[in-house]
A protein has these predicted regions:
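Short, low-complexity, charged amphipathic interaction modules
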Residues: 1-34
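Generic structural signal of hydrophobic/aromatic residues within well-ordered alpha-helices
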Residues: 20, 40-43, 145, 149
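Short aromatic-glycine-(Arg/Gly/Cys) micro-motifs in beta-strand/loop hairpins
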Residues: 91-127
Length: 155
């Protein structure tokens, strides 16, 4: 038996090996969602044009709705894309749910903190569509999409 060592290219994994013809296929390693979603357009691409929230957003755009209304739908799309299919289970107090909450003396302030729920009690000051599955994603969204939050939640 002959052994051949093949170096797997960085950023790839072995997808398949055909023993008949010796063909080795590589596939790119999936990138972290934070690397894939950096803009609203990235979030829309991640969900796909036929996603109901994306379709609703396009309709809302065509109606010429105010920026803060469109901004809310943009946050729904961004949150949904970053959560990668995770939907909060409000009946499960074991799961933490993260929501961005901004504090400030004026509408231009940029301080924020993060809230979660636990199994002893639940505090909810947000709609479930804007909850994240991790603190890391909530912090990322708050920083990366701060302008979208600002236009949605301030006058």
């Amino acid at each position: 038996m002959k052994t051949v060592q093949i170096e797997i290219p960085k950023g790839f994994k072995v997808e398949s090996f055909d023993e008949v013809n010796g063909l080795l296929k590589f596939a790119p390693l999936p990138k972290d969602i934070k690397e894939r979603v950096k803009t609203l357009d990235d979030a829309i691409s991640a969900l796909g044009a036929s996603d109901k929230d994306v379709v609703d957003y396009r309709v809302m755009q065509s109606l010429g709705l105010q920026d803060h209304v469109l901004g809310n739908q943009e946050l729904v799309i961004i949150t949904k894309a970053l959560n990668e299919g995770w939907v909060p289970d409000w009946g499960n107090g074991e799961w933490d749910k993260w929501f961005n909450w901004f504090y400030g003396g004026s509408s231009s302030s940029g301080r924020f903190s993060f809230l979660s729920s636990d199994n002893l009690r639940s505090t909810s000051t947000c709609g479930s569509r804007l909850c994240f599955k991790s603190k890391d994603l909530a912090e990322y969204a708050a920083n990366q999409f701060f302008d979208t939050y600002k236009k949605t939640f301030t006058i």
